[in-house]
Amino acid sequence: QFDVAICETVTRSRSQIFDHASEAMNTVMANYEGARKAAGREGKFSMRVIDSKQIFAGQGLLAAHTLRLINQKVSKNTLRHEVETFTDKIYTCVIPRDLHYIRERARRRGDKSLSAMAAFMGKVLNINPVIFGQGVEGKPVAKTRDFNVAVEKVMNYAIGRLEAGLLTPYVSLSCGLSWTEIEELPGLNRLRDACEKHGVELLLSQMGITSS
């Protein structure tokens, strides 16, 4: 039905999905002509697998930006270039509630960036850090002893960046909470108001089990 397919995966540094998708792409590209002919389609088909270089909400932002470019009917080469360039311009804030849980999940994936002592002290002292970074490279930029305080800090930052001007008219927010808890997040309604005022779409979602 389509002439071009784009698959954007979670960062290849934390998952094998990119490699598996690339293998699938090679199979598709080697065998698509028969299926395309049977469907009555003429011309070539192309497929591209792109490493989003993102985890959590960053991948959703890239998907929204990609769809926007497609709707603008940019050329195939321009689309590929713009998407791959944009992956290096996405910044993410993460607020983990349980550092010990985060460490254990990361350790099973070979990531030893968070020490056992840091995770233990964070849990004992009820510290909720705000981690900020580009792609998967992040570092703590704030530490609070209240989850809601950390959330409000991030909401305030998001509103500030929104008012300063964004490269794409989207803000992606993904939460490992129930919808009731999400709606009660401090600063969420102010963020919604700021998005509406500046013509920005808020992409609000529950975090999938593989992320949370």
Language-model segments: residues:
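Glycine/charged-rich beta-loop-alpha catalytic/anionic-binding loops adjacent to active sites
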Residues: 2-7, 37-50
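Class I S-adenosyl-L-methionine
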Residues: 1-24
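Mixed-charge interfacial surface used for oligomerization/domain docking
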Residues: 17, 22-26, 33-39, 48, ...
